[in-house]
Amino acid sequence: MASKEMFEDTVEERVINEEYKIWKKNTPFLYDLVMTHALQWPSLTVQWLPEVTKPEGKDYALHWLVLGTHTSDEQNHLVVARVHIPNDDAQFDASHCDSDKGEFGGFGSVTGKIECEIKINHEGEVNRARYMPQNPHIIATKTPSSDVLVFDYTKHPAKPDPSGECNPDLRLRGHQKEGYGLSWNSNLSGHLLSASDDHTVCLWDINAGPKEGKIVDAKAIFTGHSAVVEDVAWHLLHESLFGSVADDQKLMIWDTRSNTTSKPSHLVDAHTAEVNCLSFNPYSEFILATGSADKTVALWDLRNLKLKLHTFESHKDEIFQVHWSPHNETILASSGTDRRLNVWDLSKIGEEQSAEDAEDGPPELLFIHGGHTAKISDFSWNPNEPWVICSVSEDNIMQIWQMAENIYNDEESDVTTSELEGQGS
């Protein structure tokens, strides 16, 4: 039996490598930017910070990322990294690529540098890290324990204490187990939600300050789910509304003004398998999306949750991340176990397709990023550079990329499919 499994693994590995080679050959046609960077350890989390600096007379801008580590029994860190992203006028040429390193060059002086700027000791791997919108120096993290940690990275040395001691500014208590979901309220400073394997969602107000030492107890614990709560998200326009999704296949909408924490305002059987993630649309107060182990992304309208608006189908395995674009109301991306990051355009739902196009996926599937050869752990849309995404996968690879403008601008591409498929063969 073992040999059969080994054989299947080898075949899969071969297929993955083959697909990667084809992807790499086609990058000049498909992307305006691709930067591939091997991290020292895999990161389970990634988020762009909102800050951007444009150095005088340089052909790049500086951006920052929040990352974490997932080591093999070595010291873990919360990481802030600095990234050089070439300006539009710095000619990026994806065809200049060093095939051994998987590095893409061709920016003139910029080689798409990525440097670790701050490393802070962390207790165990960083399951997820998210900055507080009202003060991006403040970062909350999910740990392998039940504690949620809060760090103000300006109060920590750039190089971690060699003792390995983890010294968070606050320690948030209320969960019994670890988890992944984490969401800061963009309308109420300091209000943080966390989802856990203990079937609950905790809410803290970090402004309340610690009761003793650095410990802050949960302000409320929401107990509606009957299984692991995978993700939680505040509504972006209503300060008291949030959503949670869980392995009980349900999406729940909660209102913190309600006098009960055991029953949500709305409950919907969202998928036919575990629901792993959700995201509220930043432009439309009624629209949200959920992603599931049933390999689909579902679109919902808060005014009528009984009816699923749309199902996005193309992923071949579980979906773990879904995020709306910060710049375009109709653009959404999803990723997960199938090593693909799909970008969807709601405005194309129902468009007519040729039989040939239909084979590639539904009309609303705008783009498939195929650069990862392992499961994608997380991704983040750059808030300052439209269409730039950073994605991280389980094999230590981080990619910063932007699809070619002709793909999202609806202009007829001058690249024929035969050129793409047959290139170099």
Curated annotation (Swiss-Prot):
GO biological process entries: brain development; cellular heat acclimation; chromatin remodeling; DNA replication; negative regulation of cell growth; negative regulation of cell migration; negative regulation of DNA-templated transcription; negative regulation of stem cell population maintenance
Positions of modified residues (N6-acetyllysine): 4, 119, 159
One GO MF term on file is: RNA binding
Q: Where is this cross-link: Glycyl lysine isopeptide (Lys-Gly) (interchain with G-Cter in ubiquitin)?
A: 4
Read off the SUPFAM superfamilies from this record: WD40 repeat-like
Keyword Repeat found:
yes
Which positions does the entry assign to WD repeats?
Answer: 47-122, 128-173, 181-217, 228-269, 275-312, 318-369, 376-403
Keyword Metal-binding, does the record have it?
no
Per its UniProt record, what Gene3D superfamilies does this chain match? Answer: YVTN repeat-like/Quinoprotein amine dehydrogenase
Q: Which InterPro entries match?
A: G-protein_beta_WD-40_rep, Histone-bd_RBBP4-like_N, WD40/YVTN_repeat-like_dom_sf, WD40_repeat_CS, WD40_repeat_dom_sf, WD40_rpt, WD_repeat_RBAP46/RBAP48/MSI1
A Pfam entry, by short name: WD40
The entry's localization annotation reads: Nucleus
Glycyl lysine isopeptide (Lys-Gly) (interchain with G-Cter in SUMO2) crosslink, residue number(s): 4, 101, 155, 159
Q: What keywords are annotated for this sequence in UniProt?
A: Acetylation, Chaperone, Chromatin regulator, DNA replication, Isopeptide bond, Nucleus, Phosphoprotein, Repeat, Repressor, Transcription, Transcription regulation, Ubl conjugation, WD repeat
> What's a GO cellular component annotated to this UniProt protein?
ESC/E(Z) complex
Phosphoserine is found on: 3, 95, 354
Residues that the record marks as modified (Phosphothreonine) are 10
State the disease linkage annotated in the record: Spermatogenic failure, X-linked, 9: A male infertility disorder characterized by spermatogenesis maturation arrest and non-obstructive azoospermia.
Q: Which family does it belong to?
A: Belongs to the WD repeat RBAP46/RBAP48/MSI1 family.
- Give the record's subunit note: Binds directly to helix 1 of the histone fold of histone H4, a region that is not accessible when H4 is in chromatin. Subunit of the type B histone acetyltransferase (HAT) complex, composed of RBBP7 and HAT1. Subunit of the core histone deacetylase (HDAC) complex, which is composed of HDAC1, HDAC2, RBBP4 and RBBP7. The core HDAC complex associates with SIN3A, ARID4B/SAP180, SAP18, SAP30, SAP130, SUDS3/SAP45 and possibly ARID4A/RBP1 and ING1 to form the SIN3 HDAC complex.
Q: What does this protein do?
A: Core histone-binding subunit that may target chromatin remodeling factors, histone acetyltransferases and histone deacetylases to their histone substrates in a manner that is regulated by nucleosomal DNA. Component of several complexes which regulate chromatin metabolism.
Name it.
Histone-binding protein RBBP7
Write down the species.
Answer: Homo sapiens (Human)
Q: What is the lineage of its organism?
A: Eukaryota, Metazoa, Chordata, Craniata, Vertebrata
